[in-house]
């Protein structure tokens, strides 16, 4: 005669099911999570301006052209790059909602700084006078207009996320999921 051993295990999965239901409910509207992720991206952009460095690589932005820097100094400006009047830095905006988080700007010249490139060729004409006048090499010049072939602008990326930002985002997502599972998020 062979003896049979029968083991029966009953598991109460109601707590697991309830936790998964809470997580599912929290994921129906991820706006609170996306708001936190947009804040991380916004802080990354703020640091890029403060450090004058690429937020993705950490590399310092290329220095200003010495001639351009001298012209700025003549007008009294000796401040930070990309912040002559503050328009670009103060027009960085966050957008977020269910399933998306983004940081950007609608400033027209932002793209040339973010990606680098060559500005459009154009004519320069006087605003309030009949002619332009300047001195160069001890010689005087007067012209009604001059053609500018465009300027090469180096990339000075200010939008983006680096390794630390990505880690912060991953931790934020994990904390959001953990809080939802534990019933601390609605």
Where are these regions (language model features)?
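Short, Lys/Arg-rich flexible segments
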Residues: 1-186
């Amino acid at each position: 005669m062979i003896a049979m051993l029968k083991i029966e295990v009953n598991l109460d999965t109601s707590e697991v099911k309830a936790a998964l239901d809470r997580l599912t409910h929290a994921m129906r509207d991820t706006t609170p999570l996306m708001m936190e992720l947009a804040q991380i991206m916004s802080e990354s952009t703020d640091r890029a301006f403060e450090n004058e460095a690429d937020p993705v690589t950490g590399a310092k932005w290329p220095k200003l052209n010495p001639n351009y820097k001298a012209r700025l100094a003549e007008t009294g400006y000796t401040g930070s790059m990309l912040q002559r009047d503050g328009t670009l830095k103060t027009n960085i905006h966050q957008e977020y909602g269910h399933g998306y988080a983004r940081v950007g700007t609608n400033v027209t010249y932002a793209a040339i700084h973010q990606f680098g490139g060559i500005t459009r060729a154009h004519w320069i004409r006087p605003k309030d006078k009949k002619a332009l006048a300047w001195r160069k090499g001890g010689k005087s010049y007067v012209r009604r207009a001059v053609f500018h072939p465009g300027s090469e602008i180096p990339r000075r990326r200010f939008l983006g996320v680096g390794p630390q930002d990505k880690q912060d985002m991953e931790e934020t997502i994990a904390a959001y999921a953990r809080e939802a599972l534990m019933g601390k998020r609605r």
